[in-house]
UniProtKB/Swiss-Prot annotation:
Catalyses which reaction(s): RNA(n) + a ribonucleoside 5'-triphosphate = RNA(n+1) + diphosphate
EC number: 2.7.7.6
The name this protein goes by in its record: Probable DNA-directed RNA polymerase I subunit RPA2
Gene name of this polypeptide: rpa2
Zinc finger (C4-type): 1089-1118
GO CC annotation: mitochondrion; RNA polymerase I complex
Ranges annotated as spanning the membrane: none
Complex formation: Component of the RNA polymerase I (Pol I) complex consisting of 14 subunits.
Native organism: Schizosaccharomyces pombe (strain 972 / ATCC 24843) (Fission yeast)
Biased composition (Basic and acidic residues): 1-16
PANTHER family: DNA-DIRECTED RNA POLYMERASE I SUBUNIT 2
Length: 1174
């Protein structure tokens, strides 16, 4: 390995003009970009509008004498085509020659990168000739580097010319200047019936059991609908579906009878086949057939008519459709929607019933919905297309609703043949679909009438933070299980399953609440985004001996062959195994021809076809041969042993295959595949941990998180970014010790830390509990020196209502005399000088009101000084009005101070506890002084041996000028890392084990023990004292509890919790607790009755003789009404004039104010609190 320093320098000076230098980096984001491209390239939007179909309305509906409805003129309308343009300047802007709008402009102007959405709207009246027109329905956000972005296909040199990173990957949207990403979610595998045992199913009604079968059916436009079969204890199965967030149940027999003109015998044979000896199965089918007789529906027409009459109102169909047509519409829209033909739906439903009965009988086990075998990925582009489809349908529904409203109100001019009438309808409805999509991206909230067959309504988008490049890249490889699962108390969904090998990284997941729910794709895991051509598969299967599908019963002991949820045949399990092997060889052979350029015809078997052969077993998974070619599947490359060629595997088929991790693990005639590299199981970020195979696993997990929290290099085009907060490491270095993949992904473009000389020694008392001592001279030379950039925007247009004239302008009012202190910071145009230092309260921008001639300033609010780095003037979309908005970027210097957090790449985090003078630092024989000193106690319990190895390797690499390879799994017990790097150290004249004699910097004497010293790559994390320190003497308090409010920004108090309480007691300073928890918090004085112990019944009173008694505060509860016989001096009265005696035994005590509040709350609940006063 080499550092590639000169090559990198040449690349920066002369960026490539032909293509990317790091194809693997672009490939990491490919699923996001390709899924958005599929909206137009794969015709998903055209499929969507075809699926929406026609809407219709009538200009009159009257009821005739027989009860029949008479319809007037009928208008039928639909959307024929969807067009998404590329972002261009507004047509109102007429001066520009180049009219393209690039993402950099949207970032800098804090606007949305969007383009026009145009629909081809067509209509006909009474079935006459069809008319059409193009309607613009708003501006929709566009994904960066997609086929609707001007950056598509640009080389690094061209990207730099357009103010982008040289390796800009895209895959995100820009909304109001913020980069937003639709994150990937896990969904159930499409078009595959999944057996489920769920106790909650039994709560749905009488006779319902815990057994069910679910299938998530996906249409060609990628919208989905989940169908569920329920098993009832009386043998009947019920078919469940959702329509517009409402749930409906229909007997499965009714669906079967409605799909085809069939007989009970055909249904019996279709479920049972030739397996007549299975009495459990035959009894249940017979019970189901008998139970259906109660409906009295025998023919297909009768059944369709019955369904149509029940669901007419629910479906909201046209009034002129018959009940039979409504029934057919129901079957088309909600029953196994991935299949078009009724006979295919019929066959699959029979198979599902058969599998459900097998689950109940214990012939097969329930499928695990938490296993990647039964999961797929919801891609951002597909979700975006589904939302767009629903908004288009809502738009059509709003047109129909407006026409119906006009007809009901007998509005003048309702004439379907008049084009002007439709124009008036369009003017009355909301034609802006783009704003709804922009709202979705900016908030992540899904506003939907149907719910889109998803389990959550929020949390779909995240900000693609550029804290550092690791964090930015991780966003695109992140896969979330779903918000619903985060609330579950069970940990089952979080478990790492063996089926995830090679698809989900076992290391890269957060610790804490999202652990196991927020995962990341393995490095080589890809996601299919386009459906493959499998039109030749059915005929190929028939030629291999598979029996064609038929309604009549299949042989006993035969397995079902399915292709994307469609039954394509039946065969024996032995033949199914043979067919699976043949298909695999055929797809590999075609891939070889394709690579060699010898392919002359389309592939019969596409390379990414998933061939899932499930063998028969005892109480195992339901057997069969399942083929999948649809999008959103995870696939990964492995090496096929017999041919030596690449094969793409999916998680469904991998479970039943024998894949060796290393070539030496291959078992002859058993292993079929071998991994290309054992590191392919890890994510990109997890692969960057050096020698991760030497570390305890939690430490590798911690490093994956801390690597993304590092103050690093977010990018090279920082001049053109307007982030709210941006961190930058000024003295970033390339690591001496790094894996080969560090160069593969070009991470030297974005350095994330600094190489430091680290000594492991307990030298002072300042290195306890993971603290580290920093060499003061290393700090002065720039170790860990960083900068924080903060952006502030000032918009004068928000100071006026829409439509009002512009009266506010930047600068000072003509003829006015600004203050001298303002002019020290601000120029004559009211904007700050570049490079000026701003303290808290200093003016940052000035503006004036031309109507009053008054000057105003906006001040800088910050706890630390900032320097004005850039000032941007932001115009509007057309550029035809005065500048009303500016953006100021502030540079805040952050050199490391005591309390700032650092970490190595092995999860060894700690804070800087002291900057030690270099004259007092220990030194080696050669005069080398460590940059960092850490305590030896950091290692025994953490077992981060990888950090020892890195120290050895870094020291040897620095001596020889080598970039050391730290890829995991390359060393073994026969060839150890310690030997390899130890010999390099010996050649450089150092100790084999990395130890050196060191001399005390205070006494100059040699230390008795040799000290372990070497070079380790250290990261400075973003957790800094400057952002977190909190001091309070007095400040705002809560109006109810009278305690200090919380929050650093609000000058709030510091939390004193149970651990702090225990520490104070443990140190024998318990009186400090009273000071902290009461005297300095909510100290209050309150009167209490000594007799009854109440603080609620105390009241101020008036003495009858007018002379103040010993206690003017008395207890109303202990007092008795005065009878007039008592001494006048003992009688007192309350505010209403009632006279009492007694209740004088009260005293003043100190209490927390919140205790009074608690007492009042308990009293409201009829709970009396009594205090014992001594």
């Amino acid at each position: 390995m080499s550092f590639q320093t000169l090559e990198r320098e040449r690349t920066f000076k002369n960026p490539p003009k032909d293509g990317t230098s790091f194809p693997d980096l672009q490939k990491a984001v490919k699923p996001h970009v390709d899924s958005f491209n599929a909206l137009t390239n794969a015709g998903l939007l055209n499929y969507a509008v075809k699926e929406i179909g026609e809407k219709c309305a009538f200009d009159s509906i009257t009821q005739e004498e027989g009860g029949a409805l008479k319809f007037g003129n009928k208008i039928s309308f639909r959307v024929d085509e969807v067009q998404i343009a590329k972002p261009m300047l507004s047509s109102r802007e007429r001066s520009s020659i180049n009219r393209k709008v690039y993402p950099a402009e949207a970032r800098e102007r804090l606007t949305t990168y969007k383009s026009r959405l145009v629909l081809k709207f067509s209509w006909s009246v009474n079935g006459g000739p069809r008319q059409s027109e193009m309607r613009e329905v708003g501006m929709i956000p566009i994904m960066v580097r997609s086929n609707r972005c001007h950056l598509e296909g640009l080389s690094p040199a061209e990207l730099i010319a357009h103010k982008e990173e040289s390796e800009e990957m895209g895959g995100y949207f820009i909304v109001n200047g913020i980069e937003k990403l639709i994150r990937m979610l896990i969904l159930p595998k499409r078009n595959h019936p999944t057996a489920i045992i769920r106790p909650s199913f039994a709560n749905r009604g009488t006779s319902y059991s815990q057994y069910g079968l679910s299938i998530r059916c996906v249409r060609p436009d990628q919208s989905s609908l989940t169908n569920t079969l329920h098993y009832l204890n009386n043998g009947v199965t019920m078919f469940r579906f959702h329509w517009r967030k409402n749930e409906y149940l229909i007997p499965s027999m009714m669906i079967l009878k409605a799909l085809l003109e069939t007989s009970d015998k055909e249904i019996f044979e279709g479920i049972v086949g030739k397996d007549l000896g299975n009495t459990f199965l035959t009894d249940r089918v017979e019970l189901m057939l008998r139970a259906y007789k109660s409906y009295g529906l025998y023919s297909q027409t009768e059944t369709l008519q019955y369904l149509g009459s029940k669901f007419r109102v629910v479906l909201g169909v046209a009034e002129d459709l018959t009940d039979v047509e409504v029934g057919r519409f129901l079957l088309q829209k909600v029953v196994l929607v991935h299949l078009r033909e009724a006979k295919d739906k019929f066959r699959l439903l029979l198979f599902m019933i058969r599998k459900l009965y097998a689950l109940v009988a214990g012939e097969c086990c329930a499928d695990n919905p938490d296993s990647p075998q039964h999961q797929e990925i919801l891609l951002g582009g597909f979700l975006y297309g589904q939302i767009l489809k629903e908004k288009i349908e809502d738009w059509l529904n709003s047109i129909r609703a407006q026409i119906n409203l006009d007809v009901r109100r007998s509005a003048p001019g309702v004439d379907f043949s008049d084009r002007k009438y439709l124009t008036r309808v369009f003017s009355k409805i909301n034609n802006d679909i783009g704003t709804k999509l922009q709202y979705f991206l900016s908030t992540g909230n899904l506003v939907s009438n149907t719910g889109l067959d998803l389990q959550q309504a929020t949390g779909y988008t995240v900000v693609a933070e550029k804290l550092n490049f690791y964090r930015f890249l991780s966003h695109f490889r992140m896969v979330h299980r779903g918000a619903f699962f985060a609330e579950l108390k069970t940990t089952t969904v979080r478990k790492l399953l063996p089926e995830a090998w090679g698809f989900m990284c076992p290391v890269h997941t957060p610790d804490g609440s999202p652990c196991g729910l927020l995962n990341h794709l393995a490095r080589k895991c890809e996601i299919v985004t386009h459906p493959s051509d499998v039109s030749q598969i059915p005929s190929l299967l028939l030629s291999l001996g598979v029996d064609p599908p038929s309604v009549v019963g299949h042989e006993s002991g035969w397995g079902c062959v399915q292709l994307d949820g469609k039954i394509v045949g039946w065969c024996t399990y032995k033949l199914a195994k043979h067919v699976a092997d043949v298909l695999r060889l055929m797809k590999i052979e075609y891939a070889v021809k394709l690579r060699n350029g010898t392919a002359t015809e389309p592939a019969k078997v596409p390379l990414d076809l998933e061939i899932g052969y499930v063998p028969p077993s005892h109480n195992g998974q339901y057997p069969g041969l399942y083929l999948f070619s649809n999008p959103a599947r995870m696939v990964r490359p492995v090496k096929h042993i017999s041919t030596g060629e690449l094969d793409m595997l999916g998680p469904f088929e991998q479970v039943y295959m024998d894949i060796a991790c290393f070539p030496k693990e291959i078992v002859p005639k058993v292993s079929t595949h071998v991994e290309y590299s054992p590191t392919n199981v890890l994510s990109i970020v997890a692969n960057m941990t050096p020698f991760s195979d030497f570390n305890q696993s939690p430490r590798n997990m911690y490093q994956c998180q801390m690597g993304k929290q590092t103050m690093g290099t977010p990018g090279t085009a920082l001049r053109y970014r307007t982030d709210n907060k941006l961190y930058r490491l000024q003295t970033g270095q390339t690591p001496v010790v790094r894996p080969k993949l560090h160069n593969t992904y070009g991470l030297d473009h974005y350095p994330n830390g600094t190489n430091a000389v680290v000594a492991v020694i307990s030298y002072t008392g300042y290195d306890m509990e993971d603290a580290m001592i920093l060499n003061k001279s290393a700090h002065e030379r720039g170790f860990g020196y960083g900068t924080v950039y903060k952006g502030e925007s000032f918009d004068l247009s928000q100071k006026r209502r829409r439509g009002e004239p512009v009266v506010h302008h930047f600068g000072f009012a003509p003829g006015s005399t600004p203050r001298r202190e303002w002019l020290q910071k601000l120029d004559a145009d009211g904007l700050p000088f570049i490079g000026i230092k701003l303290e808290d309260g200093d003016p940052i921008v000035a503006y004036y009101d031309e109507s009053t001639g008054q000057n105003f300033i906006e001040t800088y609010h910050g706890t630390e000084p900032g320097f004005v780095d850039e000032v941007r003037l932001l115009g509007n979309d057309v550029g035809d009005s005065e500048c009303q908005q500016i953006h100021v970027k502030l540079r805040i210097t952050r050199s490391p101070i005591i309390g700032d957090k650092f970490s190595s790449r092995h999860g060894q985090k700690g804070i800087c506890s002291q900057k030690w003078p270099t004259v007092d630092m220990p030194f080696t024989e050669s005069g080398m002084q460590p940059d960092i000193i850490i305590n030896p106690h950091a290692f025994p319990s953490r077992m981060t041996i990888g950090m020892f190895i890195e120290s050895l390797a870094g020291k040897a690499g620095a001596c020889h000028g080598l970039a050391q390879d730290s890829t995991p799994f390359i060393y073994s017990e026969q060839q150890t890392a310690a030997d390899y790097f130890g010999e390099q150290l010996v050649k450089a004249g150092y100790n084999y084990h990395g130890n050196e004699p060191m001399y005390s910097g205070i006494t100059g004497q040699e230390m008795k023990a040799d000290i372990y010293i070497g070079v380790v790559y250290y990261q400075r994390l973003r957790h800094m004292v400057s952002d977190k320190f909190q001091v309070r003497t007095t400040g705002p308090i809560h109006n109810l509890t009278r305690q200090p409010v919380k929050g650093r920004k609000r000058a709030g108090g510091i939390r004193f919790g149970e651990m702090e309480r225990d520490a104070v007691i443990g140190h024998g300073t318990s009186f400090l607790m009273q000071d902290r928890l009461m005297n300095c918090s909510d100290y209050a004085q309150s009167w209490v009755c000594r007799d009854c112990g109440s603080i609620i019944s105390i009241m101020s009173t008036i003495s009858m003789n007018g002379v103040g008694s010993a206690s003017e505060v008395r207890c109303r509860s202990c007092a008795k009404p005065a009878l007039g016989l008592e001494d006048t001096s003992d009688i007192w009265q309350d505010g209403s004039g009632k006279k009492f005696v007694g209740g004088t035994n009260t005293t003043l005590i100190a209490l927390p104010s919140v205790f009074n509040y608690l007492t009042a709350e308990l009293t409201a609940m009829n709970i009396k609190m009594m205090l014992e006063v001594k």
